[in-house]
Amino acid sequence: MTLTFGSNSKTAFLFPGQGAQVVGMGLELYERSGAAKDVFGKVDEALGRPLSKILFEGPEDELRETINAQPGIMAVSLACVGAMNENLDKDDIPDPVLMAGHSLGEYTALAAAGVLSVKDAALLVQKRGELMQEACDSNPGTMAAILGLDEMTLEEIARESGTFVSNINTEEQIVISGGKMAVARAMDMASARGAKKVIPLRVGGAFHSGLMESAKAGLIEALNNVEFVEPNVPIIANCTAQPLKSAEEIRGELIRQIASCVQWKRSVDFMIRSGVTNFLEIGPGKALAGMVKRIDRNANISNISDLESILAFSKN
């Protein structure tokens, strides 16, 4: 599910991760775009269940489950890609020089860049969600967002509290994870050291931390059963904030990523240093756009999440 590229603008495509889900997402695309409907059909067929029904109708608690939220967000993002190709002239679609996805969104980026088929991406994302849930059951944990402290301070707090730094989203928005008691200690320590805000996250476990190590073996097995094609656009890796250019690099990244910190700020910084001035977030929500704006106030940011925003984008 690759975009038909057009202009030569210095644009990066961004794909959101878990947390962007909302009941009803993708329904308008399904009803009004044949290409989007085809994406939802392929995902449902690959998973052997009517995931799209959960996306469109809920209930919210069921949609929030990792095995539904992750492939669901990916499906909506790829449906947006399909609808863009279907409804915009080639010259209206910016030619991305780089792509990146936040956590789960990295898999969406791989599909958009032609590395994975929609079917294989859906199966991998569902398997990843199952493995993460199993790891959560074996090693219960949670996460918290810390606002207003720098990375060095959070690294110190993580060492002292027995937690992990899991997402470095912006200079002052960092997520920690670990066992529930350890995260509670870290939150208290962060508050004592001057954090502007400490926010416990409603998540099912300590994602992107050492507590997810047990998920790697199953993921390696799943990745070995999938064919990877060389990307037609470099993808910025979550773990290293460097471009992935080969199938071998991509496999290694996906294995590391499940239990490692998402280096989102460094990823955006790399894209900016590479000359990117325009960022297009494709999929539900606007979380990544907000992060990019906090990283670089001068960045030009657009969002594509439904047919209305796609048609409006063509007029820009």
Regions found by a protein language model. Name each.
Residues 2-153, 278-308:
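FabD-like malonyl-/acyl-CoA
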Residues 19-20, 47, 113-259:
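Alpha/beta catalytic cores of group-transfer enzymes, especially the acyltransferase/condensing modules
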Residues 35, 72, 76, 182, ...:
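Charged catalytic carboxylate motif
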Residues 103, 227, 275:
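Conserved functional loop/turn residues at catalytic and ligand-binding sites
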Residues 191, 272-275:
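Non-catalytic positions within long, well-ordered alpha-helices that form the structural scaffold/packing
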Residues 200-203, 272, 305:
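Short glycine-rich catalytic loops that host catalytic nucleophiles or stabilize transition states
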Residues 265-269:
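Short hydrophobic/charged patches on amphipathic alpha-helices used for structural packing
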Residues 310-315:
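Short, charged, surface-exposed secondary-structure boundary motifs
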